A protein has these predicted regions:
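Central I-helix of cytochrome P450 enzymes
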Residues: 158, 162, 214-218, 245-264
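Active-site substrate-recognition loop segments, prototypically the cytochrome P450 B′-helix/B-C loop
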Residues: 1-153, 162, 166-180, 184-212, ...
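Short, charged hinge/linker segments at domain and secondary-structure junctions
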Residues: 180-181, 229-240
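Alpha-solenoid HEAT/Armadillo repeat architecture
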Residues: 121, 125, 226, 245, ...
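Short, glycine- and charge-enriched coil/turn segments that flank and shape catalytic ligand pockets
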Residues: 144-149, 230-231, 245-250
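Conserved hydrophobic/aromatic pocket- or pore-lining residues that grip, position, or stack substrates
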Residues: 161, 221, 240
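Proline-centered turn/helix-capping motifs that create local helix->coil transitions or kinks
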Residues: 172-174, 225-234
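C-terminal domain-closing interface element
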Residues: 213-230
Length: 264
């Protein structure tokens, strides 16, 4: 993995990387195709942003993600932000709202990962096997009720994985439609059909919408946290909210990070 002598990415390609609207068009595919062929390890310089490196080849990405000594995550935000947004974020909160495993360097990453790893051992998961099979039967029944024709995604594939995850987490069954709504709103920009309705929404407004949805989801998990501290059960939420690292309860941002990485 070596940068070329002129590693600077041409302006038209660099600008697309920070333009939310580009992610709803084929222009982004063209950009990454050009980068992989001509400048796989380049630096983007865009007005309003600090210069940032862009790694586009698979093996290089693997090398970077596995070498946290040379490429530490540090205290940088999990998403690319312009200077104004980064400054505002630093001024309005002392610690990040969400700190997940994917944002942690060693040795912190392993300490937090080990908090829940025992819960996912086969012996423990077998205790929930019948509940998960019941969810699968309900999902299959919904498909049968379509009468041989219907939307498999909205009728089956969106619901069943979420139902299993929420069962593991400890979310009550009656709250599943609400959680499905929130997860769809968070990941709406990745859906080609939703992209068509979003393409004309200004980037700043879109960011506000997604932040509001995330805040709503975290508000729900705050209530779940309070409930599990009062009434612990055998679910994963109970493990997370009562977890400790180095003899101290985990921070609210780390707790939020665990919820988000599991729920989404």
């Amino acid at each position: 993995m070596t940068a070329s002598s002129d590693a600077r990415i041409p302006d038209q390609y660099a600008a697309r990387l920070v333009d939310p609207k580009a992610y709803a068009t084929d222009a982004l595919h063209e950009t990454y195709t050009w980068l992989r062929a001509n400048n796989p390890l380049g630096i983007a310089e865009v007005d309003g942003f600090d210069p940032f490196w862009v790694v586009t080849r698979y093996q290089d990405l693997q090398d970077v993600s596995r070498d946290n000594q040379r490429f530490p995550y540090g205290n940088r935000p999990s998403t690319l932000m312009n200077r104004a947004s980064a400054s505002k974020s630093m001024q309005t909160q002392e610690t990040p709202l969400v700190l997940s495993l994917i944002q942690m360097d060693e040795p912190m990453h392993m300490k937090y990962r080990m908090l829940t790893q025992p819960w996912f051992m086969p012996a423990n998961l077998r205790k929930r096997e019948e509940e998960i099979r019941q969810l699968a039967r309900k999902s299959a029944a919904r498909m049968v009720d379509m009468g041989g024709q219907g939307d498999f995604v909205s009728g089956v594939s969106l619901n069943y994985p979420l139902e299993v995850i929420m069962n593991i987490l400890g979310v009550p069954e009656q709250d599943l439609p609400y959680m499905l709504k929130l997860t769809q709103e968070i990941f709406g920009p990745l859906d080609p059909d939703i992209q068509k309705t979003m393409k004309d929404i200004p980037a700043a407004e879109m960011s506000q919408i997604q932040q509001a949805v995330m805040g709503e989801m975290l508000g729900y998990f705050d209530k779940l946290t309070e409930e599990r501290r009062k009434n612990p059960t055998d679910d994963l939420a109970t493990v997370i909210v009562n977890a400790q690292v180095d003899g101290k309860p985990i921070t609210s941002s780390a707790l939020n990070g665990y919820y988000m990485i599991i729920a989404t």
